[in-house]
């Protein structure tokens, strides 16, 4: 991912790149820029004779300072919950450096709408045919199974995993699922520290959220906030092609944090830090760990994650949307409703076409549950079983009908 890069920062960005900053990623690069120099000159010193030769002072005062130093603040009893969580999970958080050959002249992230949506249009061209990037990840098993974001390692020719102790290991990408932005990497090692998995499905807004990762290449950075909201749909976040209900947090998530863990107050992983909104502050998003873990298990065992597929294009009707479709000529004949989920198009030969679904049908129920939005339909389909009948109730004209659709696997040629 990349930060908005403004003209006044270009010089700083180049310096950072030259000194090992992240400069792009397989599928999503990280460009560094900073608006200020954090190194400040020494404070002025008074060099007057008075200050150099102070008069001696006699005193019988006995220092009240203890003769022994107090107990270190690093003592477990002195640590706050944030420090304890970081101490617990920090060793299992890794840095992931990837490199690939550039395939686009449109900048480090090419023309991918996912990254343009989050980080804007001001992405400079990349003259180097190689794209390098830095992200984060965390260790799931002591023998080297690592979870990260798909955009961190997608298309990478080389992947290097750096442990907290500085050890650098060669990583092998075992699988990528772009529909959830989850990927898994394997390193050859033993007795590695591992994270503890929490329950993302039990979260409540207002709970503490702790992010660990390598933002802007600054290893082992910790930021803190709260869970701002739960269940953000991909369309709400701005990436409608992702089959994820995101956790929203105001914990700072920056380029390089991608793939790192989001923790609860106990130091358990509850999410995978994934994205921020460039047009706002304090809007970070993470994939719930239960979603990511399920995908990771499939990627490690099968090398891929199969998502159920119907083969329909649909929209959530509102009075405004109905009017817009009517004006553009895209409203199927006979449709008068201005609420519900309207099928606009059915892909030829798809499971939906084979079951008899047609443009103009308004979806009422999926799997016995009522649906009001296209997101509702997508989520009901996502939890269905490939090849098993899925009951879909529709209204065609003024008549309700029940269809039995057998979802197929999402076609690879659609690029997920």
Curated annotation (Swiss-Prot):
Q: Which GO terms describe its biological process?
A: proteolysis
Superkingdom of this entry's organism? Bacteria
**Region Disordered: start and end of each range?**
35-57
Stored SUPFAM superfamilies = PDZ domain-like (SSF50156), Trypsin-like serine proteases (SSF50494)
Q: Which residues form the PDZ domain?
A: 320-398
Please give the Gene Ontology molecular function terms for this protein.
Answer: serine-type endopeptidase activity
| Family matches, as Pfam families | PDZ_2, Trypsin_2
Residue spans with biased composition (Polar residues)? 35-53
Keywords for this entry? Hydrolase, Protease, Signal
How is loss of this gene reflected in the phenotype of the organism? No effect in a single knockout, but growth is inhibited at high light (120 umol photons/m(2)/s) or at elevated temperature in a triple protease knockout mutant (hhoA, hhoB and htrA). Triple mutants are not phototactic. No effect on the PSII repair cycle, even in the triple protease knockout strain.
* Induction, per UniProt: No induction by UV-B light.
Which residues are the signal sequence here?
1-25
Q: What does this protein do?
A: A putative protease, its function overlaps that of the related putative proteases HtrA and HhoA.
The record's similarity note reads: Belongs to the peptidase S1C family.
Protein name as catalogued: Putative serine protease HhoB
* UniProt organism field: Synechocystis sp. (strain ATCC 27184 / PCC 6803 / Kazusa)
């Amino acid at each position: 991912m990349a930060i908005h890069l403004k003209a006044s920062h270009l010089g700083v960005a180049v310096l950072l790149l030259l000194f090992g900053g992240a400069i792009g990623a397989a599928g999503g690069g990280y460009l560094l820029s900073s608006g200020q120099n954090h190194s400040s000159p020494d404070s002025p010193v008074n060099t007057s004779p008075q200050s150099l030769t102070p008069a001696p002072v006699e005193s019988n005062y006995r220092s009240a300072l203890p003769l022994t130093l107090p107990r270190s603040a690093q003592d477990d009893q002195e640590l706050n919950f944030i420090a304890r969580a970081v101490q617990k999970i920090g060793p299992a958080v890794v840095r992931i450096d990837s490199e690939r050959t550039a395939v686009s002249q449109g900048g480090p992230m090419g023309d991918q709408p996912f990254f343009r949506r989050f980080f804007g249009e001001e992405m400079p061209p990349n003259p180097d045919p190689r794209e390098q990037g830095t992200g984060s990840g965390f260790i799931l098993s002591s023998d080297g199974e690592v979870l990260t974001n798909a955009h961190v390692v997608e298309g990478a020719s080389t992947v290097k995993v750096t442990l907290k102790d500085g050890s650098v290991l060669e990583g092998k990408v075992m699988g990528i699922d772009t529909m959830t932005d989850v990927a898994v990497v394997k390193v050859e090692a033993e007795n590695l520290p591992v994270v503890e998995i929490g329950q993302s499905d039990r979260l409540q807004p207002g709970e503490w959220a702790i992010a660990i990762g390598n933002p802007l290449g600054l290893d082992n950075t910790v930021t803190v906030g709260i869970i701002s909201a739960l269940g953000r749909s991909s369309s709400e976040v701005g990436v409608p092609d992702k089959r994820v209900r995101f956790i929203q947090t105001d914990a700072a998530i920056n380029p390089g944090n991608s793939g790192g863990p989001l923790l609860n107050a106990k130091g358990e992983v509850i999410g995978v830090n994934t994205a921020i909104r460039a047009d706002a502050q304090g809007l970070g998003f993470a994939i719930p760990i239960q979603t990511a873990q399920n995908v990771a298990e499939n990627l490690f065992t099968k090398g891929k994650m199969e998502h159920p597929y119907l083969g329909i294009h649909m929209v959530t009707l509102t009075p405004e949307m109905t009017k817009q479709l009517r004006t553009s000529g895209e409203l199927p004949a006979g449709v008068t409703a201005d609420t519900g989920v309207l099928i606009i198009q059915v892909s030829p030969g798809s499971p939906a076409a084979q079951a008899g679904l047609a443009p103009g049908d308004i979806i009422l129920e999926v799997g016995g549950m009522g649906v009001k939005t296209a997101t509702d339909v997508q989520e009901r389909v996502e939890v269905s079983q490939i090849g098993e009948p899925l009951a879909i109730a529709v209204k065609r004209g003024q008549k309700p009908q029940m269809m039995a659709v057998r979802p197929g696997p999402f076609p690879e040629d659609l690029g997920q």
